Amino acid sequence: MEPVDPNLEPWKHPGSQPRTACNNCYCKKCCFHCQVCFTKKGLGISYGRKKRRQRRRPPQDSQTHQSSLSKQPTSQLRGDPTGPTESKKKVERETETDPVH
């Protein structure tokens, strides 16, 4: 290690910054250009804000599709259409007719 001038700020020490500027190339040489390039390009770590993906615009026909859906009748509930009260009455009748228990 060479002795460093104590009057220099740490960011101005020789060898602290590369001679060439960083670029957007992802080749092996550029990935190992400096520590910043290595973490960003080599490791794929960036601490900046993530860009929001824009949603793809729906096709123009989507509005007509929505209107056709609203014209369709709503589906009826599955199961016993009379509801749960009818099944309770059936259970009460079965217990009355079966006195063995």
Curated annotation (Swiss-Prot):
It is found in: Host nucleus, Host nucleolus; Host cytoplasm; Secreted. Residues 49-86 are annotated as: Interaction with the host capping enzyme RNGTT. One of its GO terms (molecular function) is cyclin binding. Gene3D superfamilies: Tat domain. Its main location: host cell. It comes from the Viruses. Residues 1-24 are annotated as: Interaction with human CREBBP. Asymmetrical arginine methylation by host PRMT6 seems to diminish the transactivation capacity of Tat and affects the interaction with host CCNT1. Residues 86-101 have a biased composition (Basic and acidic residues). One of its GO terms (cellular component) is host cell nucleolus. Residues 61-77 have a biased composition (Polar residues). A motif (Cell attachment site) lies at residues 78-80. GO terms for biological process: DNA-templated transcription; positive regulation of transcription elongation by RNA polymerase II; positive regulation of viral transcription; symbiont-mediated perturbation of host chromatin organization; symbiont-mediated suppression of host innate immune response; symbiont-mediated suppression of host translation initiation; symbiont-mediated suppression of host type I interferon-mediated signaling pathway. The modification N6-acetyllysine is found at K28, K50, K51. The cell attachment site mediates the interaction with ITGAV/ITGB3 and ITGA5/ITGB1 integrins, leading to vascular cell migration and invasion. This interaction also provides endothelial cells with the adhesion signal they require to grow in response to mitogens. The Cys-rich region may bind 2 zinc ions. This region is involved in binding to KAT5. Transcriptional activator that increases RNA Pol II processivity, thereby increasing the level of full-length viral transcripts. Recognizes a hairpin structure at the 5'-LTR of the nascent viral mRNAs referred to as the transactivation responsive RNA element (TAR) and recruits the cyclin T1-CDK9 complex (P-TEFb complex) that will in turn hyperphosphorylate the RNA polymerase II to allow efficient elongation. The CDK9 component of P-TEFb and other Tat-activated kinases hyperphosphorylate the C-terminus of RNA Pol II that becomes stabilized and much more processive. Extracellular circulating Tat can be endocytosed by surrounding uninfected cells via the binding to several surface receptors such as CD26, CXCR4, heparan sulfate proteoglycans (HSPG) or LDLR. Neurons are rarely infected, but they internalize Tat via their LDLR. Through its interaction with nuclear HATs, Tat is potentially able to control the acetylation-dependent cellular gene expression. Modulates the expression of many cellular genes involved in cell survival, proliferation or in coding for cytokines or cytokine receptors. Tat plays a role in T-cell and neurons apoptosis. Belongs to the lentiviruses Tat family. Interacts with host CCNT1. Associates with the P-TEFb complex composed at least of Tat, P-TEFb (CDK9 and CCNT1), TAR RNA, RNA Pol II. Recruits the HATs CREBBP, TAF1/TFIID, EP300, PCAF and GCN5L2. Interacts with host KAT5/Tip60; this interaction targets the latter to degradation. Interacts with the host deacetylase SIRT1. Interacts with host capping enzyme RNGTT; this interaction stimulates RNGTT. Binds to host KDR, and to the host integrins ITGAV/ITGB3 and ITGA5/ITGB1. Interacts with host KPNB1/importin beta-1 without previous binding to KPNA1/importin alpha-1. Interacts with EIF2AK2. This is Protein Tat. It comes from Human immunodeficiency virus type 1 group M subtype B (isolate YU-2). The lineage of its organism: Viruses, Riboviria, Pararnavirae, Artverviricota, Revtraviricetes. The gene is tat.
